[in-house]
Amino acid sequence: MLSLFDTFNARRQENITKSAGGAIIPGQKNTVSIFALGPTITDDNEKMTLALLFLSHSLDNEKQHAQRAGFLVSLLSMAYANPELYLTTNGSNADVKYVIYMIEKDLKRQKYGGFVVKTREMIYEKTTEWIFGSDLDYDQETMLQNGRNNSTIEDLVHTFGYPSCLGALIIQIWIVLVKAITSISGLRKGFFTRLEAFRQDGTVQAGLVLSGDTVDQIGSIMRSQQSLVTLMVETLITMNTSRNDLTTIEKNIQIVGNYIRDAGLASFFNTIRYGIETRMAALTLSTLRPDINRLKALMELYLSKGPRAPFICILRDPIHGEFAPGNYPAIWSYAMGVAVVQNRAMQQYVTGRSYLDIDMFQLGQAVARDAEAQMSSTLEDELGVTHEAKESLKRHIRNINSSETSFHKPTGGSAIEMAIDEEPEQFEHRADQEQDGEPQSSIIQYAWAEGNRSDDRTEQATESDNIKTEQQNIRDRLNKRLNDKKKQGSQPSTNPTNRTNQDEIDDLFNAFGSN
């Protein structure tokens, strides 16, 4: 029988890893032009002007996405003293072939400020005109926030220096990557949220903040050009973080890289954190056993990917779909139940998925609130916890959890409607059990965390009483004012202002009825 189980496990492993084989046939590649600055360009203002020009070309809708991505690569490579070496190290890709052109400054030429595109000694006039003579939709005024009110490039470079200004542009492109692939709808919001930290520490100057439309355009390029994303991921992988001479730009790239790592795998790692690593007794349930075995196989697959494992979703690795929580719904539902109890921030996590197992979700919450389940016997022995301290800790946990005897609802998605539709039946079922004297389920005895209905009725009654009291106060004030008017004289006043006040009093008095 045990050998049969081993066979099943081997079949599951093969189904996940999908053993490779067959011949390697090269595919078609796009030829993409990359532009690097030559040694004749030494002025910092000119370098920054070219950086903004590359960004403008990347936003030009008249160009193909592959070439627009090439201009972004040109901008990213400006962070390095040797762009050719950077592209040789990180630019190997199955989709594109990079061709590097140099931009030089020829003092004998007056057109386009003396800039010229060349390779070795060959000058490309048409390419020069294509880059420097094009009418672009985006310029400094449109691709940067409040461009017309920003300082000039010369002012920014003079104040902050060229490396700092260039780094401000490059780091924003990296921030776009955080959400560009895994969360399209939250791209703009996520970008400005993460950008705020870099604005506060002075990394990104206010005059160089990208506009929201620019962020969306760059995100669109990243989604359509996997070669650009691959280059950026390879940059993170090959960057030697143990070096002592990392530039400021490289350090900031590493900071953003922490957000990019494991992007799209939050459900997988939250399941392991709250479902497996908590090591509660519920893991012994046979219902969870298949999903636990699948998690084990997935973790082995993840580790087999080596340094590229944290980026399987960003790189759109064919196996990244195996890590979706729909492939292990029972243990995921249980883990989310534990999570919403142990970590309040997880109560905002979208758990209302179509594959959510409500029973497992409730079980996770019930187990997480249980004082005995929260204590590890292994750690008790290791730490030398006395019996009295253990009982005291249990008592404290019970006191804390005594006010939380209701289940948290799943948030977002179709499971909310499903839970609400089932709720009246659950209440009715509990009422029948109480009448028949039958024992209640340890799971169903919890209500959804929305407050008792009696509390709602009490709030409504209190609100109604407050309204009646306020109405009575208004009546009393109106009566008092009316009596004062009568005492002043029995004849009605001919003053228009007094007449208006009297009409207003009469209308208000009639609106609330007679006393």
From Swiss-Prot:
Q: Give the protein's recorded name.
A: Nucleoprotein
Q: Which protein family is it in?
A: Belongs to the paramyxoviruses nucleocapsid family.
In terms of one coarse class, where is the protein primarily found?
virion
Biased composition (Polar residues) is annotated at 489-500
| Function field | Forms the helical nucleocapsid (NC) in a ratio of 1 N per 6 ribonucleotides, protecting the genome from nucleases. The encapsidated genomic RNA serves as template for transcription and replication; encapsidation by N is coupled to RNA synthesis. Forms the encapsidation complex with the phosphoprotein protein P. Before encapsidation, the newly synthesized free N protein, so-called N0, is chaperoned by P. Together with P, inhibits the integrated stress response (ISR) in the infected cell via the formation of inclusion bodies (IBs) shielding its own newly synthesized viral RNAs.
Alphabetical GO CC annotations of the entry are: helical viral capsid; host cell cytoplasm; ribonucleoprotein complex; viral nucleocapsid
Q: What high-level taxonomic lineage is stated for the organism?
A: Viruses, Riboviria, Orthornavirae, Negarnaviricota, Haploviricotina
Q: Which residues form a coiled coil?
A: none
Q: What spans are recorded as compositionally biased (Basic and acidic residues)?
A: 452-487
**Region (Interaction with the phosphoprotein), start-end ranges:** 457-466
Renumbered residue ranges of the record's region Ncore: 1-403
